[in-house]
Regions:
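Conserved catalytic/switch belt of AAA+ P-loop NTPases
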Residues: 102, 127-144
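Conserved beta-strand scaffold positions in the cores of enzyme catalytic domains, especially
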Residues: 68-70, 162
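Conserved alpha-helical scaffold flanking the Walker A/P-loop in AAA+ ATPase domains
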Residues: 12-18, 82-112, 120, 131
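Conserved D-loop-proximal element of ABC-family nucleotide-binding domains
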Residues: 123-124, 154
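Residues immediately C-terminal
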Residues: 120-121, 135, 151
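A short hydrophobic beta-strand->loop->alpha-helix junction that borders the nucleotide-binding pocket
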Residues: 28-29, 70-75
């Protein structure tokens, strides 16, 4: 997908001063909002051919540009950032960000390294990257992509320009969906944190009903139509990871709490909760617990899903009365 399909990306690009960009850039935003597309567009602008003075976008898009290093690993490790002898392969070598940026550009004015999933770098990897940020080689740029705010060291943030891509408003998201040929779903059918490209991905993979199904499972449990074991089994069977299930549960609590605070009636899959009783503070505290769990999960992902679900289902039943 081209950046022209995403007007909010075009707006961000139009605000950037490419003649005065810092050596470090952090692009932050939810999954599916266009962070990679923005990084690609910025990289193309920076990688002007020093002979023809035009962009080599095709080389960037195909990840075959000699002055472009696109690191797209699920987890960014130390040897991806700096040379580690024990990770060296005599035949293949070991490409890393710091060594790449230290070399003179081949065909472009600049060199650009893009680090996807930068939030997965541990402190040692980030400190190794600081070398290229504190003492950058001439005409070198590092673009880091993260899906969480404030997930890197303060020393990293202090040396970078941060570009936050916010979620779209419901009306803007629906308009974008229609313009892209999607008229049979509404943005309100998805959690508020779901982004445009994520909706398209869920539609393509037939996962667009996951949130509604999750709410139905929770509703059945709270209204005593399903016991704890059956509910846990049904939640685990959903084709989403534990973090997304936590996000869904937080979204559910946000929606019912907001309706109470604003005296608004709920509709759709939430309408049964118009007659429910709950303490606002209890719901707020439960959301705080879930947010804390989500934070801990990123540090220690080996969390027992069944135990987690059992605890929070019990808290839900104690907090929401029918």
């Amino acid at each position: 997908m081209k950046s022209l399909d995403l007007p909010w990306i075009i707006n961000i690009l139009s605000t950037l001063s490419f003649s005065n960009l810092p050596h470090g850039i952090i692009i932050s935003g939810p999954d599916g909002i266009g962070k990679k597309i923005l990084a690609n567009a910025i990289s193309s602008r920076l990688l002007i051919n020093k002979t023809t003075n035009i962009e080599n976008s095709d080389l960037v898009n195909s990840n075959s540009h000699p002055d472009y290093f696109y690191l797209n690993n699920e987890k960014v490790l130390l040897h991806n950032i700096t040379f580690r002898k024990n990770k060296w392969d005599d035949e293949k070598g070991q490409r890393n960000v710091n060594d790449f940026l230290s070399k003179t550009p081949s065909i472009s004015i600049n060199k650009v390294a893009v680090i996807v999933n930068a939030q997965t770098m541990n402190d040692e990897s980030q400190n190794a990257l600081l070398k290229s940020l504190e003492e950058p080689s001439p005409n070198s740029y590092i673009i880091m992509i993260t899906n969480r705010p404030k997930c890197l060291l303060n020393t990293i943030y202090s040396r970078c320009q941060v570009i936050n891509i916010p979620s779209l408003k419901i009306d803007d998201l629906n308009k974008w969906l229609i313009n892209n040929g999607v008229s049979d779903v509404n943005a309100l059918d998805f959690p508020s944190f779901t982004s445009p490209l994520k909706i398209l991905e869920e539609l393509e993979n037939n996962q667009h009903l996951n949130f509604k199904q999750f709410i139905k499972i929770i509703t059945e449990f709270i209204f005593n139509n399903s016991d704890t074991n059956s509910t846990i089994k049904n939640i685990i069977s959903l084709d989403i990871d534990l973090i997304m299930k936590i996000n869904y549960l937080i979204e559910f609590l946000k929606i019912i709490l907001k309706s109470r605070l604003l005296s608004e009636d709920l509709s759709g899959v939430f309408k049964d909760f118009n007659s429910s009783n709950f303490n606002n503070l209890k719901i707020s505290n439960l959301m705080n617990e879930l947010n804390a769990l989500r934070y801990d999960y990123f540090k220690v992902p080996q969390i027992n899903e069944t135990h987690i679900l059992n605890y929070f289902l019990s808290e839900l039943k104690n907090s929401i009365k029918i």
